[in-house]
């Protein structure tokens, strides 16, 4: 490796926008490392990070309020390029001597920005740009040294620039896909203005991660809880590439997995990739612990506690394991820091954001803690994991434990597994699986009368659920074809003895959540 992939970096200061993580993902997509910190970060931390450029995010506050957040003064004293987005532009304008006012005309949705003059931020772009606006306040007077480089019919300063100091502000959101050339604008800033190179690629991330794992663990042995999910699977492949047979994976089959999932994990990681895997069949133990529990939160906690106990027991059998590998990813780190302090912080190493025992005397290996989920999937492909596994729909940590409503019984799980497998199989066959964001089946603990042949049956009900969403914060129910739903229903009722009725969930989020529990 000729250059360190972290040498060139962008700092993003978070003012609370729902899109802030998306800004970071776009910068990474461009091929440059970045980190996301709270707006009130200390000057010393910025100096230590030594960014090549700083982006000020959007946010829900109003710059016109006395106690609204401001960028640290050092941002404008540091000599590095700065891009303000939405609220970020407004606080930049106000802090540097311009004026912001609350507007009677709020701009939400698509807008056409008329580009004026020559600005690095709009390099190689046409004179009119389709963008996405989401603001009430607006800049009414730009600071000295700035020029107007974009306007809309209702926003006189939709973009401003101080080319000499390399300060730029845009009132719209270049990070969202609704802004047609938003990625190009961010590239113009990150690559053009800041002078960064595209060092952050899947290949270089893998090379860097493997080197760091080798340096961290040396000749020691490592243990990993392998679930078959995306994060733990990619960690397994990275650590195995770094240290080979010194990695031992523990796969706990809790009886709450999808149909044949346990065998699929063993076949792929054991037989195909040659990893050392200990499989623990703990179905009876989990179901016993869940007896009589119907509250969703109590079920989640019980499943988590039993997993920790089982994993702890297995890890103690591996006397030489000095390190624990975990699938912590960057959003986990951000959310963990925010939940403890109310704000996102600098990435600190060895912060256990999982629920494993505090007394587990092992060092932590977390090779994904700098990565977003989409980056994890990309390096998974590069490491040889199958697309179907990396891009399948989300599956909750407690598994079927929160898809069997109420008390969990083996009979219910077995029925649900088979019904869900039919639904997913038919989605693939109809080329609909990748057109919905998430699809699954829920077991309802209610019986319903049905007719089979000349006889009546009194059996269980399942609900099909399919949603379309961009960020899983909000979701629409998927309008699947009636013929398709009819086929799935017929197959489930005919092939799964014990189910007499199939319903389809047409609730959006909000008011409903995506999962039922």
Swiss-Prot record:
Top-level lineage group: Bacteria
GMPS ATP-PPase domain sequence ranges: 200-392
Active site annotation, chain numbering: 86 (nucleophile), 173, 175
Pathway participation: Purine metabolism; GMP biosynthesis; GMP from XMP (L-Gln route): step 1/1
Keywords (A to Z) from UniProt: ATP-binding, Glutamine amidotransferase, GMP biosynthesis, Ligase, Nucleotide-binding, Purine biosynthesis
Residues reported in the UniProt entry to bind ATP: 227-233
Catalytic reactions on record: XMP + L-glutamine + ATP + H2O = GMP + L-glutamate + AMP + diphosphate + 2 H(+)
Domain Glutamine amidotransferase type-1: 9-199
EC number(s) given by UniProt: 6.3.5.2
GO molecular function: ATP binding; GMP synthase activity
Top class in the EC scheme: ligase
GO cellular component terms given for this protein: cytosol
Its job: Catalyzes the synthesis of GMP from XMP.
Subunit text: Homodimer.
Protein name (record): GMP synthase [glutamine-hydrolyzing]
Organism of origin: Vibrio vulnificus (strain YJ016)
Gene: guaA
